[in-house]
Amino acid sequence: MGSRPCALGLFCCCSSCFCLCCPRHRPVSRLAAAVGGAAAVPAVVSGVTGLILSPSQSPIFIQPTPSPPMSPLRPGLDLVFANPPDHSAPLGVTRPSAPPLPHVVDLPQLGPRR
């Protein structure tokens, strides 16, 4: 995939970035016209998430950003599965190390309801 001449006479390195003025990526050129001279705007181009880098009114390039590695488990679940529950005590029996439950306090009535 080497460098190809761009529509504006520049070169497009399609392997590393997406040139929005290149005929190969022309469907995205509407996005470039809408963005104008923005410094860095998140965008999705052909399924690749990247940043639109445009320091001036020159052609806009989108450089793909690396995606974080996907974990098979959601964060926090690894701790749940790492420490399985201890079933040594039958259900309904409290352990001696557990703190006692607070006593229930009856609150006085605030007055008759109207």
UniProtKB/Swiss-Prot annotation:
Query: Which residue pairs form cystines in this protein?
Result: none
Subcellular location per UniProt equals:
Host endoplasmic reticulum membrane; Host cytoplasm, Host cytoskeleton; Virion; Host cell membrane
Query: Cellular component terms, GO, for this chain's entry?
Result: host cell endoplasmic reticulum membrane; host cell plasma membrane; host cytoskeleton; membrane; virion component
Please state what the protein is called. Protein ORF3
Q: What does this protein do?
A: Small multifunctional phosphoprotein involved in virion morphogenesis, egress and counteracting host innate immunity. Plays critical roles in the final steps of viral release by interacting with host TSG101, a member of the vacuolar protein-sorting pathway and using other cellular host proteins involved in vesicle formation pathway. Also acts as a viroporin and forms ion conductive pores allowing viral particle release. Impairs the generation of type I interferon by down-regulating host TLR3 and TLR7 as well as their downstream signaling pathways.
Instruction: Share the domain note from the entry.
Output: The PSAP motif is necessary for the release of membrane-wrapped virions from infected cells.
Which parts of this chain are annotated as the region Homodimerization, and interaction with host AMBP/bikunin?
72-114
What are the start and end residues of every segment in region (Hydrophobic)? 6-22, 33-53
The extra comment attached to this record reads: The viral particles present in feces and bile are non-enveloped, while those in circulating blood and culture supernatants are covered with a cellular membrane (quasi-enveloped).
Q: What InterPro entries does this protein map onto?
A: HEV_Orf2 (IPR003384)
Q: What ranges does the record give for the region Induction of host SIRPA expression, renumbered to this chain?
A: 6-22
Instruction: Share the record's PTM remark.
Output: Palmitoylated in the N-terminus.
